[in-house]
Amino acid sequence: LALDRVTLGLQLSDLIIVAARPSMGKTAFVLSMARNMAVDHEQGVAFFSLEMSSVQLMMRLIIAETGLSGNDVKSGRLTPEQWRHLESATKPLGTAPLFIDDTPALSVFEFRSKARRLKIHNDIKIIIIAYLQLMTGNQDTKGNREQEVAFISRTLKAIAKELNVPMIALSQLRRATEMRGGSQRPQLSDLRESGAIEQDADIVAFIHRPEYYGINQDENGMPTAGMAEIILAKHRNGAVCDVNLRFLKEQARFADVEDSMLPPAQAVESQQAYDDYASGSNSQPGTSGLGAAMGGEFDVNRSTKIDDEAPF
């Protein structure tokens, strides 16, 4: 993406916060990054999803990879040609080193244990969390949500340094963002529940889609339909600027503006490929791999005492 040319890629030990209001495409954005790292570059990616299940994420990956209609894929209403295309297009996902953990209400201490194991056993190169505000901190901060989020943010940065990997965490924005007039572009002060997030992050990027707010043209008179602005509001080691991307909503993915739309899908031999991805995933929350069956290999045994010492 053009974003890579601005950030010069993700730097080791960086904490990158990607924030936006609902329906801006936060999950699609980081899932696109995870897919590019795991499939195109064969780099290990750990994706901790506290909101969506692994099955839902895999479905999004299939839709983005094939370019097929999301409704058609979910319902299974595909032509034989489309089924052949789906099977062919999703084969790279089957061997991709992408590990998804969908444990809900994950504590930072459980997260640290799982991330360490994934680093040791699978040499992951990047960690993605969706999203920060759904994590829990330590008992000392219970009752004060701002302090708890500050503790979580600080801990995530410490873990990124310990494991020497870039860490991307999705974050919510305050509703006040939408109460402002004008373009309703997000600002650093809109980060929800803690100013510590801004302080701890090396990069803070906002996703903004003017089209969502009924703004049909930008300040230069260009149409905003299908466009997204990635606003680099903080960049510790580089310039702050805006990057325009195309948001392909139907395919739940982002692309460079100059990229053409995907060609019409051709498509898959039998429904077996769909079944393998859509219903063959583990039904219980835990860590699963697209390219390897991981079962509960990296789960924390809740009957044992969790190492809850702050990692810094």
Functional labels for PLM-detected ranges:
Residues D4, L8-M52, L106, F111-I120, ...:
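P-loop NTPase nucleotide-binding module
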Residues N36-D123, G137, V243, A265-Q266, ...:
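Cytosolic-facing regulatory segments adjacent to core modules
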Residues I124-L170:
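Helical hairpin unit composed of two closely spaced alpha helices linked by a short loop
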Residues L50-M52, L78, Y131-L132, Q172-L173, ...:
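Short, ordered loop/turn segments at secondary-structure junctions
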Residues A2, L15-A19, F29, A46-S49, ...:
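Structured core elements
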Residues M24, Q43, G67, K142, ...:
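Short, small/acidic-rich helices and loops at N termini and domain boundaries
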Residues S107-I124, F151-L163, A176-F312:
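C-terminal regions of RecA-like/P-loop NTPase motor modules
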